[in-house]
Amino acid sequence: MTDSDCVLCAGREMDGVLLVTEVWSNEFWRLTTTTVGEIAGYSYLSTHRHIEDISALDGDEQESFGAVVWRTTSAIKEATGADHVYVYVMGDGIDHLHLHLAPWRGPTSPLVDDPIKGLVTR
C-alpha cells in the first residue's frame, strides 16, 4: 500500500466515509472520534506519517507517544464520564498505525459486548 492509497493518510478527506471527526491534532498525531456508534466517545489516535506499527515510530513520535496517549485518554475519560479508557492497537483492517481508545462505563457499557462491530473479512 502506498500513502496515497491509505484512508488514514487522506486525513479529513475521508472522515465522512470513516464516520469520524477530528477533535485534536499536532505535528505527529491525529485524534478522531466516531460520529455514530454504540460507544459515545470511541476514538482513534493515528500518526500523520504513514507507518504500519508501533515499532516504526521515529524518535520524535516515540518521545511524544506516552504523553499523547495519556492526554487523549484523560480528555476522553473526562468528556464522557467513563470509568476507564481502554487502548487497543489493531491494524488488520487498515495498514496505518492507529490506536482504538474505548471509553468504558461499567458493566452496562456496550463495550462489554463487542467494541468493533461489522463484518470481518480475510
Where are these regions (language model features)?
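HIT superfamily nucleotide-processing domains
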Residues: 1-122
